[in-house]
Amino acid sequence: MKEVYLDNSATTMAYRSVGELVQKVMCEDYGNPSSMHNKGVEAEKYIKEAKETFARLWKVQEKEVYFTSGGTESDNMALIGAARANKRAGNHLITSSIEHPAIINTMRFLEEEEGFRVTYLPVDQYGRIRLDALKEALCEDTILVSIMYVNNEVGSVQPIQEAASIVKAYNKDILFHVDAVQGFGKYKIYPKKLKVDMCSICLLYTSPSPRDY
C-alpha cells in the first residue's frame, strides 16, 4: 500500500542527498571544528558554510547566527538569557496564551523560580493575539516580549511585524523574540524587517533536514 504522510508540520523526511551528506560528515569529516588539525578544519568549513547560508537567507550578519540542538533549546536560551541579562531594567515579560510549551514552560519557570512577572495575552476567535491587549500590557518594567510566528496546533499566523512595531514604539529597548519554528520554510522571514531582536527556528518541522534526536 502506498503511504500518504500528512504530519510534515511535526517532522519531515530528509532528502536522500541530505542523509548521504550527514553520513559523509559523521564517517569522514568528523573532526572537532574547534581543533586546528585537518579534520577539525574540514569540520569547521561546514559550520561556516551553514552560517553564511542562514545569514544570506535572513539578511543578517554571520555573527548574529547561533546553532543550538533544536527549537526548544533556542527558545530557552533566548528567553532565559534575555530575562536574566536585563533584570536590572525591569522584571515584566509578555507572551501569548497559546505559545508552544517551549515558551510557556520557560515563562512559568522565570515567573515561579526567578521572580519575573509574566502577562499572557489573549487571542481572538482566529487564534491571533489582540494587539490592543499588547498595547495595554506594556509598562515601564517590560523588558521582553515573545510571540510565535505560526501556531503549532491550529496554524494561526501572528501579526509579528505589527506587534514588534507597537513594542518598539513604546520602548525601543524592549527585546522582541519570535518562535518561528513552524514558520520557517513556509514564509520568508527577515528578522530586521520584522523588527525582532531574536528569532528561533528548527529545520526539523519545515525542511528535509536531518533529525535532531
Task: Describe the predicted segments one by one.
Residues 82-104, 117-122:
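Conserved PLP-anchoring active-site segment centered on the Schiff-base-forming lysine
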Residues 34-73, 77:
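Conserved N-terminal alpha-helix of the aminotransferase class I/II PLP-enzyme fold
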Residues 119, 123-183:
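Active-site phosphate-binding strand-loop segment of PLP-dependent enzymes
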Residues 205-213:
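Single conserved hydrophobic/aromatic residue that forms the stacking wall/gate
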Residues 61-65, 89-91, 140-141, 173:
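Short acidic capping loops at alpha-helix termini that bridge into adjacent secondary structure
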Residues 5, 175-178, 184, 190-204:
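Conserved active-site segment immediately N-terminal to the catalytic lysine
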Residues 1-35:
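N-terminal "arm"/small-domain region of PLP-dependent enzymes with the aminotransferase-like
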